[in-house]
Amino acid sequence: PFPPDNPKRMLSLRKDAADFLKKNAGKQPFFMMVSHYAPHIPFMCTREAFERTKKRWIEAGLDTKGLDELTDDPIVNPKGEANKKITYAAMVEEMDLTLVDVLDALEQTGELQNTYIIFTSDNGGGYAENRKVDGGIRRFNGPLQEGKRSIFEGGIRVPTVISGPGIKAGSQCDVPIVQWDFLPTFHDLSGSESSLPPNVDGGSLRLVFKKGNKGKVKRVAPGIIHHYTCHYHPPISSIIIGDYKLMRQLNSGEFLLFNLKTDYREEKNLAASMPEKVKEMDEICRSYIKKVKGGTAEQVRQAHHKLMDHFGQQSIDGYRKKLADLK
């Protein structure tokens, strides 16, 4: 359970991050990763953050239906749409304050200009069907298709903000990257003389940091490839090369081809009009998946089920131990 004065452990994570930097920054090269439990269900925030966000909500003239008096402190899984949205917004704000603490700590140690900072997310927003909001239809993860667990852009396109030495302030870069690029990037930036394993999927982003859109990423994989990432979603493989993204439904064999530069919403399927592009990208994707023994749809599904069974058994064993300890 989360401490009542520290919902989602946001406050202690902020403090621990700042304390680590004050203790270590400037003495030797360091790496720190802060992974919050927020934003994620259950929605939680402090009473102070809720009231602050509620005030802005009302001042903005937003829907106050269901804005009932709350007794929880902190606010936990509130009822009513307005309360849920306010709690979620307050939770995100409390999480984002980690950046303030991190930047302040780096500034105090004199290492702010000598440190790479990466702000990103592990997946896209939660998938939600179209809903009627304020008299209109809104897709809550729009304008992107689908969301978390999906290989459509709504599931894999995430915010990524990077600052550090050699990166031009206020610049925007459209070179596609993927999070498994970070390991070879950190290895490259650290100046390590040891080598990475030969078949690491990602590539260093050093040239992208320095040259922006003119930078290139050299990877072992011939593009950015995803292969059946979620066992309870339709089995799909995808590959992104340049502006184009090809998706193949592993059961039906259906192809979807999108030009992400002109159609990031993935609304216009170009597969029928560009058969040669489909063939070229599909052969590259299949060849790589075969090379790394990615498996068939059924093999991947069974591997996921086996893993879930393992997690389930761990939970059962844990509860049994707790019961035995209580007795």
Regions found by a protein language model. Give the residues of each.
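Active-site-proximal cap/lid insertion segments
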Residues: 1-180, 189-200, 248-251, 261-266, ...
